[in-house]
């Protein structure tokens, strides 16, 4: 997800997005632990998306 798309969302939408990304990250970590994850790059993508959302949230809070 692009930062420009995230900046257009409200704070509540961003918090919802963050929660869903954290759940996705947890699921991917469990798949990795049980050797079921084929695309390990998905973990990196989700981690970066989480960082983007948290950055935008802190920008909006300031």
From Swiss-Prot:
One of its GO terms (molecular function) is structural constituent of ribosome. It comes from the Bacteria. Keywords: Ribonucleoprotein, Ribosomal protein. This is Large ribosomal subunit protein uL29. GO terms for cellular component: cytosolic large ribosomal subunit. GO terms for biological process: translation. Belongs to the universal ribosomal protein uL29 family. The lineage of its organism: Bacteria, Pseudomonadati, Pseudomonadota, Betaproteobacteria, Neisseriales.
């Amino acid at each position: 997800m692009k930062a420009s798309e995230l900046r257009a969302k409200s704070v509540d939408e961003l918090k919802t997005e963050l929660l869903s990304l954290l759940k996705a990250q947890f699921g991917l970590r469990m798949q990795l632990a049980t050797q079921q994850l084929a695309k390990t790059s998905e973990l990196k993508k989700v981690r970066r998306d989480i960082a983007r959302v948290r950055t935008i949230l802190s920008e909006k809070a300031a």
